Amino acid sequence: MTSSKSVARCVCLTGPTACGKTELALELAERLPVEIVSMDSAMVYRGLDIGTAKPSAAVRERVRHHLIDIVEPNDAYSAGRFARDAAAAVRDITARGRLPLLVGGTLLYLRALRDGLATLPRADAAVRHELDAQARELGWPALHARLAHVDPVSAARIAPADRQRIQRALEVHALTGRPLSELQDSAPADDRLEVATIALVPGDRAALAQRIERRFDAMVDLGFVAEVKNLRACGDLTKEMPALRAVGYRQIWGYLDGAYDWQEARRLALVATRQLAKRQLTWLRGDRVSERWPAEAPGLSSTFLARVERFLGSGA
């Protein structure tokens, strides 16, 4: 990477949901002057605390965090905005002589920060109208299947029920004749951050599923349902808004709407979380991650400490 100005460097710790990223990052912060830059598309929203596993006030008092609680839940927050905000945070942290550590599982954010985003066509009302009409007739899963045919890479990253992203990927293909994933891969490089990415990859999927289940139940015990009730009481939110796409929120919202009982809400939330983890792992398999570490490996904290010191200290 060449540039007339110095390039800010940072380490990114990523991996699927519930794999232990936060715990490992906080262990590192006990041993190095680290500040954490959240790379989580849900933690940016105020009021989404319990269901996003947002660090507590006590933790954030002990270890400074960035890009948490920066927008209201009725606002939109994009990957492009994250890239700008995160780059500014990393440079600020570095300028103060401290160590920036990106932590999170929103992998589109990582790509935007590391590689930049391609210049894509603007939304086209006519194309979107046609896609909406097809979805009403065939259903969004059918359009997801079509996406898998024309852009299998994007389809692997997008849930069959994620209407917004399916529509955008098909719209881009209709307007350009090229897959969205191909356009993203061809985004021009510049002097963005130099990021060393470490992914925690669970070797035991059954154990990960159990951890997801335990974590969801713990969130419920902490007041997750009451948190969603408070969001509903705001009056200007719907479960279709981007903030409420975070796993668990939409399912609990449906329960509070009376669409199904609690057991079904819990089941749907767990299914959605497992599907999220699967999509994250699929993305990581196709991404140029610097290193992949077994999430269950012993001595991860010491290994991570040595790796961070080597990268930020020597440039290796």
What are these regions (language model features)?
Residues 1-316:
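Phosphate/pyrophosphate-binding catalytic cores of soluble transferases and nucleic-acid-acting enzymes
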